[in-house]
Amino acid sequence: MLGSPKLTARQQQILDLIQNAITLTGSPPTRAEIATELGFRSANAAEEHLQALARKGAIELVSGTSRGIRLKSEALRSINESRSKQFPLSLPGLSQLMLPLIGRVAAGSPILAQEHIDQTYYVESSLFQRKPDYLLKVRGMSMRDAGIMDGDLLAVQSTRDAKNGQIVVARLGDEVTVKRFRRTKDLIELCPENPDYQIIVVEPGEPFEIEGLAVGLIRNTMLM
């Protein structure tokens, strides 16, 4: 795609809303959430704008999931370039990050151990507002309704802390999983975004730690 897509003010507003949601929560908003945020009468109005954005090449819509919205890399670059003209000190220029791609994680060893690194990718930093530390290849469809599909590359920022509702990379015993984090008074729940999968309940005393937060999503084909 040559140049930036010509968007209406409303389309740009929705595109910004999608990017902010992905940055803050690790997943795009639903149609209903977009409608509520922007004062639309129904989710159908949001869907019409999303279809227009998809036709202009700014996003990709994934069928069969309420959060099936993916930003195209070109759209992200155009957003950051336009904002940098207004706020030149608040956003970095286009530069590349060198991110290790983590494959399967062996039990008991650090997630960034050398033996877990399949390869290294150079990725434009403009794809993220929060700097990731590594990419994790998604396995399975447990987060399908958050727009995270099998084979996607999840950009992860290393941290031990998470807020309710954020998508995390968590280690539970010998397993590493990607789920939505929820803490209640007595326990922790790791929630899938697919009704075919069950919530993982972390009981007190069970070996558990957060490895990182999802800060972005990249389709594997974008890095070819």
Curated annotation (Swiss-Prot):
The keyword DNA-binding applies. Its EC number is 3.4.21.88. The active site is at S142, K179. It comes from the Bacteria. It catalyses: Hydrolysis of Ala-|-Gly bond in repressor LexA. Residues 31-51 bind DNA. It is an enzyme of class 3 (hydrolase). The record marks A107, G108 as: Cleavage. The keyword Zinc-finger does not apply. Keywords: Autocatalytic cleavage, DNA damage, DNA repair, DNA replication, DNA-binding, Hydrolase, Repressor, SOS response, Transcription, Transcription regulation. Signal peptide: none annotated. GO terms for biological process: DNA repair; DNA replication; negative regulation of DNA-templated transcription; proteolysis; SOS response. One of its GO terms (molecular function) is serine-type endopeptidase activity. Belongs to the peptidase S24 family. Represses a number of genes involved in the response to DNA damage (SOS response), including recA and lexA. In the presence of single-stranded DNA, RecA interacts with LexA causing an autocatalytic cleavage which disrupts the DNA-binding part of LexA, leading to derepression of the SOS regulon and eventually DNA repair. Homodimer. This is LexA repressor. The gene is lexA.
